[in-house]
């Protein structure tokens, strides 16, 4: 998946023919687009896979940008158009806040676009020659190494650019990342950015080993890198633990920049003024840098570099999907600046994906969690862009028709973005008359229910048997366990299939997700399941036997022996009643999941339109599932971040009897469905809490508060948590990492407070932080004549992005002003992304803002 590039041809073609004028319709489309984009981001960054091509992803993002531009009130800080990478929401690894935000890169797709980018850079840079550093764009996993006084403190994934996952132990296991930097005079704090990858030459050997021991194989080296690094040691048998460590030890890293870096505190001999000199400094510290970078005086030389490596891209030790071009002069980095998601002084040239021919053997239809029936191309195995491909999505019957492919055709296949397999079309000249047309089935292939559009005019066909369709139940069980929901380790695709579609016993342990928390060891141990492909649902075949691949995921298997001696060629045996470690881990993690946050429970219920943002808003305002269930449409819609569409979806969901059964059985099994200590729906505001009628914006890192914690503290005190600063804002609580909201507050004369004052404010009210000789009420209230449109937008103004996430914040006191009427209480949708910024200041480092995706 490429990062969004608004000037790409794919994005331009994707501008919708019409933009909904009706705000309600626009809101529905925006919500659907955000859900779709976040789902594919989660697939790419979280599950290390994706079902969408670069062009399709860019088209979705561009349509969302157009709608937000046409309807500014729909834009929010957590929109995919304002954020970087994937969401850092997991309980598998501890969260780590980066000292400086890890940005992404904009893309160019042709030599002409590269020349246009360079021309703009040179215009903006003014007089003087611009030199360009060019390097290979590694297709791996972005990593941030934090060194303090030369000692590695943490290693974290990028996450959402602000908060990543702590993978320090696994990075140290690699054995190639120095725990202590070489030399002397190291700064008190420096962040080193790089990419972790799996060597291409060792990839086939890895997958062969995975097959030998019954583990899943990886689709490509990038997935191998992410899948190896992002795993924990707990709960693994000694054999699996050694296998995990062996995979990690094969990983390699190359560094390509610096994040937070207090330049003034460096020794004089470490001073650098160019990106290329940064690489010399990093190499001197003992960090691995790429040897494939060059500095050029002219963009035409960069173009030659791009062509040369494009022709020899398969000869490098790691996969590449383009060339990164950076302005070499660090002084120009600061002058050119950055947008909210990418630096202006760097770009990524994306190579056109590799194309090959293969045979289209069949088109099969898969049914997903929401009942959507999706045709998939099943092809003769072929290698493309470094990995073997057997299948690719065809999206719907209209796409099949538009591509003009017939079963039996020779088709052109490419890796979109060098990651996603995509069928381009048939090689008509090779047809011999044996080909046949694909006919979309009229019945669900899983439960034989007639397929139909969800509503008139829909292209997609869906299975309406939501309760009992095995594929939909399997998908919902997987969703319950996903990182964005209850984050249950051990409940992946194989376990979900085992619980819902077992070969043995005849009756599945789960008919719906209602019984998930009632599972016992007796339910798990007898299960035998046929392994299915995660996307198509097709049965996987054992390449050695030619038969369907069967596993017993929840009971132990006897090692293959002949005459009492281990023999890998002998058949594996089963011990009928001995639970496996996987069974123990699953039951243990299901028990832990019962006490997850209420918002995660809401997401896990698969209620249409209810994602993490809306779920947080509902949980924060109502405090319990019962309160949400009994609320009226007006009460639901009044919650900021919810609105009429989500309110209707909630009411519709609770109207269904088997939905209510899920809630009732989960509760009976011990699932906690309320926020501990919550005073009830809007109780703090209704009771005239200490912040009743006041709007508070939190930005930067506030000591003692997480991002959600600051929001909840404001709401619990009866206040409104704003996402942007306007004349209706009463206080701005600013900590390290605060961005443009701080400047806007100063310009508007809004009172700025620090973390200590914020704590007093939410606990005791405005009187506790009143200025000397000031009227506390006047101190808290902004002037009349506020701009309602600005406040209603609930989003940063255009041009507000690009703030320095590691700048030192010095709270200032502003003049006192008078108050407007009390504002509505806000929700999690209003949370400022800045609130998750750094706990510790540091000046922006050379080359550190750009992070290859």
Swiss-Prot record:
Gene Ontology process terms (BP): DNA repair; DNA replication
Any GO MF annotation of the entry: DNA ligase (NAD+) activity
Keywords recorded for this protein, A-Z: DNA damage, DNA repair, DNA replication, Ligase, Magnesium, Manganese, Metal-binding, NAD, Zinc
Entry keyword Transmembrane helix: no
Entry EC no(s): 6.5.1.2
S-S bonds: none
Binding, Zn(2+): 444, 447, 463, 469
Residues in BRCT domain copies: 686-775
GO cellular component: cytosol
Catalytic residues of the enzyme: 137 (n6-amp-lysine intermediate)
Protein family (similarity comment): Belongs to the NAD-dependent DNA ligase family. LigA subfamily.
HAMAP family: DNA_ligase_A (MF_01588)
Described function: DNA ligase that catalyzes the formation of phosphodiester linkages between 5'-phosphoryl and 3'-hydroxyl groups in double-stranded DNA using NAD as a coenzyme and as the energy source for the reaction. It is essential for DNA replication and repair of damaged DNA.
NCBIfam families found in the cross-reference section: dnlj (TIGR00575), PRK07956.1 (NF005932)
Designated name of the protein: DNA ligase
UniProt source species: Clavibacter michiganensis subsp. michiganensis (strain NCPPB 382)
């Amino acid at each position: 998946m490429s990062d969004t590039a608004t000037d790409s041809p794919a994005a331009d073609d994707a501008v919708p023919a019409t933009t909904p004028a009706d705000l309600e319709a626009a809101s529905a489309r925006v919500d659907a687009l955000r859900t779709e984009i976040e789902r594919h981001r989660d697939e790419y960054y979280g599950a290390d896979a994706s079902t969408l091509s670069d062009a399709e992803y860019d088209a979705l993002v561009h349509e969302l940008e157009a709608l937000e531009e046409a309807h500014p009130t729909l834009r929010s800080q957590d929109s995919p158009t304002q954020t970087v990478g994937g969401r850092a929401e997991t309980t598998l690894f501890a969260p780590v806040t980066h000292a400086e935000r890890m940005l992404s890169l904009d893309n160019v797709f042709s030599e002409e676009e590269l020349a246009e980018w360079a021309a703009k850079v040179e215009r903006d840079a003014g007089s003087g020659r611009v030199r360009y550093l060019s390097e290979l764009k590694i297709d791996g996993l972005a990593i941030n190494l934090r060194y303090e006084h030369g000692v590695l403190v943490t290693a974290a994934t990028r996450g959402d650019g602000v908060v990543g996952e702590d993978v320090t132990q696994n990075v140290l296991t690699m054995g190639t990342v120095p725990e202590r930097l070489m030399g002397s005079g190291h700064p008190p704090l420096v962040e080193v950015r790089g990419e972790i990858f799996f060597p291409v030459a060792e990839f086939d050997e890895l997958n062969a080993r995975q097959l030998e021991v019954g583990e899943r194989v990886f689709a490509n080296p990038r997935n191998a890198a992410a899948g190896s690094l992002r795993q924990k040691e707990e709960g693994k048998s000694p054999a699996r633990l050694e296998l995990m460590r062996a995979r990690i030890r094969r990983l390699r890293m190359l560094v390509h920049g610096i994040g937070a870096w207090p330049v003034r505190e460096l020794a004089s001999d470490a001073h650098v003024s160019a990106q290329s000199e940064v690489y010399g400094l990093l190499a001197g510290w003992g960090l691995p840098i790429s040897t494939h970078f060059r500095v050029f005086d002219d963009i035409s030389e960069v173009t030659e570099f791009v062509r040369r490596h494009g022709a020899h891209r398969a000869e490098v030790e790691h996969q590449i999907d383009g060339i990164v071009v950076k302005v070499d002069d660090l002084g120009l980095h600061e002058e050119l600046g950055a947008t909210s998601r990418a630096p202006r002084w760097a770009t990524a040239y994306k190579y056109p994906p590799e194309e090959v021919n293969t045979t289209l053997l069949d088109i099969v239809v898969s049914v997903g969690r929401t009942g959507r029936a999706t045709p998939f191309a099943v092809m003769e195995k072929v290698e493309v862009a470094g990995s073997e491909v057997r299948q690719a999505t065809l999206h719907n019957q209209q796409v099949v028709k538009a591509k003009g492919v017939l079963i039996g055709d020779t088709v052109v296949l490419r890796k979109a973005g060098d990651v996603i397999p995509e069928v381009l079309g048939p090689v008509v000249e090779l047809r011999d008359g044996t080909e046949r047309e694909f006919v979309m089935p009229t019945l669900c292939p899983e439960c034989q229910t007639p397929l139909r559009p969800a509503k008139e005019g829909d292209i997609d066909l869906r299975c309406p048997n939501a309760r009992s369709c095995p594929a939909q139940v399997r998908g919902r069980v997987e969703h319950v366990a996903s990182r964005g929901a209850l984050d249950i380790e051990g409940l992946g695709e194989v376990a979900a299939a085992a619980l819902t579609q077992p070969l043995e016993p005849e009756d599945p342990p789960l008919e719906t997700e209602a019984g998930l928390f009632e599972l016992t060891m007796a339910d798990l141990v007898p299960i035998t399941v046929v392994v299915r492909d995660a996307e198509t649902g097709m049965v996987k075949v054992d390449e050695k036997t030619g038969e369907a691949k069967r596993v017993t995921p929840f009971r132990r298997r006897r090692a293959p022996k002949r005459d009492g001696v281990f023999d890998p060629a002998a058949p594996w045996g089963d011990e009928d009643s001995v639970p496996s470690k996987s069974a123990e881990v699953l039951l243990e993690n299901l028990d832990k999941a019962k006490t997850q946050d209420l918002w995660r429970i809401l997401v896990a219920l698969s209620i249409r339109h209810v994602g993490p943002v809306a779920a947080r808003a509902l949980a924060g305002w109502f405090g319990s599932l019962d309160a949400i269930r009994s609320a009226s449409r007006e009460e639901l819609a009044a919650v900021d971040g919810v609105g009429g569409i989500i309110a209707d979806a909630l009411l519709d969901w609770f109207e269904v009897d088997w939905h209510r059964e899920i809630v009732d059985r989960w509760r009976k099994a011990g699932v906690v469905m309320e926020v501990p200590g919550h005073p009830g729906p809007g109780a703090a505001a209704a009771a005239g809490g200490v912040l009743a009628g006041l709007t508070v914006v939190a930005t930067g890192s506030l000591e003692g508060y997480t991002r959600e914690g600051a929001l909840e503290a404001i709401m619990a005190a009866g206040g409104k948590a704003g996402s942007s600063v306007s004349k209706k804002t009463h206080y701005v609580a600013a900590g390290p990492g605060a961005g443009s909201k701080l400047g806007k507050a100063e310009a508007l004369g809004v009172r700025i407070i620090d973390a200590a004052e914020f704590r007093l404010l939410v606990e005791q009210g405005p009187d506790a932080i009143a200025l000397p000789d000031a009227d506390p009420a006047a101190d808290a209230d902004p002037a009349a004549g506020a701009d309602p449109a600005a406040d209603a937008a609930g989003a940063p103004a255009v041009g507000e992005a690009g703030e320095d996430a590691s700048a030192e914040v010095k709270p200032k006191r502003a003049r006192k002003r008078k108050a407007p009427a009390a504002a509505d209480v806000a929700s999690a949708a209003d949370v400022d992304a800045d609130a998750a910024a750094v706990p510790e200041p540091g000046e922006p480092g050379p080359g550190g803002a750009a992070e290859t995706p």
